[in-house]
Amino acid sequence: QTHQSHAAVNYYSKNQCTWWAFKRRAQVGKPVSNRWGNAKNWYYNARKSKYATGRTPRKFAVMQSTAGYYGHVAVVEQVYKNGSIKVSEYNFYRPLKYNTRVLSKKAARNFNYIY
């Protein structure tokens, strides 16, 4: 199933985590809605929009957390054989900046995923 509605224009604030996740998913042909709001709401809104979701990381899935005031999203770039994952994201280590990081298999279990 493809999800094309509301996916043409990136209305998220530039260089925020949601802006990057929207942009990256469009780049890899897996668009998400531009109307899901703050990162903390993405998992709920994805489910409401009939996206497949779960607790297991997959390549190009959105990794989502409700921690903090706004929550956080990142994009899974790689799932390694040992279960660790590499994610790309904005606004995590430094305000409005891009970074990648590797999370252990144990750490990766603490997040929701939008496929």
Write out the residue ranges for each language-model feature.
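Secreted/periplasmic proteins that engage bacterial cell-wall peptidoglycan
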Residues: 3-80, 84-90
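Aromatic- and glycine-rich peptidoglycan recognition patches
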Residues: 80-115
